[in-house]
Curated annotation (Swiss-Prot):
Residues where substrate binds: 78, 96-97, 113-119, 125
Catalytic reaction(s) noted: N(6)-(dimethylallyl)adenosine 5'-phosphate + H2O = N(6)-dimethylallyladenine + D-ribose 5-phosphate; 9-ribosyl-trans-zeatin 5'-phosphate + H2O = trans-zeatin + D-ribose 5-phosphate
Gene (UniProt): LOG1
Classification of source organism: Eukaryota, Viridiplantae, Streptophyta, Embryophyta, Tracheophyta
Identification of the protein by name: Cytokinin riboside 5'-monophosphate phosphoribohydrolase LOG1
Cellular compartment(s): Cytoplasm; Nucleus
Tissues and organs where the protein is expressed, per its UniProt entry: Expressed in roots and shoots. Detected in the vascular tissues of roots, cotyledons, leaves and pistils, in the shoot apical meristem and in immature flowers.
Swiss-Prot/TrEMBL keywords: Cytokinin biosynthesis, Cytoplasm, Hydrolase, Nucleus
Amino acid sequence: MEIESKFKRICVFCGSSAGNKVSYKDAAIELGTELVSRNIDLVYGGGSIGLMGLISQAVFNGGRHVIGVIPKTLMPREITGETVGEVKAVADMHQRKAEMAKHSDAFIALPGGYGTLEELLEVITWAQLGIHDKPVGLLNVEGYYNSLLSFIDKAVEEGFISPTARHIIVSAPSAKELVKKLEDYVPRHEKVASKKSWEMEQIGLSPTCEISR
């Protein structure tokens, strides 16, 4: 059954590897299916391998638009065979993140490695600074992100992250529950930077950061 969503496009960060558990692959396909059921298009890192390949194929097969953003230098490594949807080749990693953010109404991280964490933490930081107010979610497959969430809680306890900024990131063990939480998300944190800051211009976001239609 199709469900109307307030999101037009969601950016998904995930590994170019599939991981060691079948549950990670299943979660990528499940998330892709959930996006399709809500008529949401996908923005992702552009690769055709690992979890990136699985979710992009699931969304594309479901009839939704797929936008892949990938640095030219990574194309030989992360693309094998045919890609699906629209592929945007960019100059570097910074431009990749900027383009992904610009085209998305929310962010979700599937399990992944250093690159996934770097992308995730950057969009969380942008939210904390007030550069955007788009929701950020973790698909916490079989507790994959429990240690990261514990670290964030420790940073709050030690005074490095404010309690309200802790609420920037939401998590859930299933795609359906996570997307519902993102739909219901309301920012609570105080924004640090001016909305007309240079960072906003760098990543190409509008001052109001409204969901694009």
